[in-house]
Design a protein with these regions (language model features):
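Active-site-proximal loop/helix segment associated with metal-binding centers of metalloenzymes
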Residues: 1-20, 25-36, 114-121
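Divalent metal-coordination and catalytic microenvironments
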Residues: 21-24, 65, 79
């Protein structure tokens, strides 16, 4: 029911409207992969959202469930996992500002980042 309600809201946007999609869970299963244990999935979602980034013309997709800060690219769209992590992972010498990063305007691309690139963020 929640997916259908959100799709109905997206469908009301004027043609060509760019979006910023924000969701607690990642929209795609391929974004919920533990690099050290790739056979184990931490996916908690639905495949019905897998194409929202292209179907609803997202400039960026933001989520935070995984507790693994990262920047990933899929289909030319940037996906930001912006969790602050668990308190035990916080470095006491840093402030919350040290953990923040720009969403828009988009930061400049990093050389070598191409389609399906992943950069895990360790602060």
């Amino acid at each position: 029911a929640r997916v259908a309600a959100t799709e109905a809201r997206f469908d009301q946007l004027a043609a060509g409207t760019r979006t910023i999609v924000v969701n607690h869970f990642p929209l795609r299963a391929d974004l919920a992969v533990l690099p050290r244990i790739p056979r184990f999935t931490i996916w908690c979602g639905t495949t019905r959202t897998a194409d929202w980034h292209t179907r609803y013309r997202a400039d960026v997709v933001v989520s935070g469930h995984l507790h693994m800060r990262s920047t990933r690219w899929r289909d030319g769209v940037r996906f930001e996992e912006v969790s602050l992590g668990y308190p035990a992972q916080w470095q006491q010498s840093k402030t919350v500002d040290d953990y923040l990063r720009p969403i828009l305007p988009a930061p400049p691309p990093v050389a070598g980042w191409g389609e399906d690139a992943t950069v895990l963020r360790h602060w």
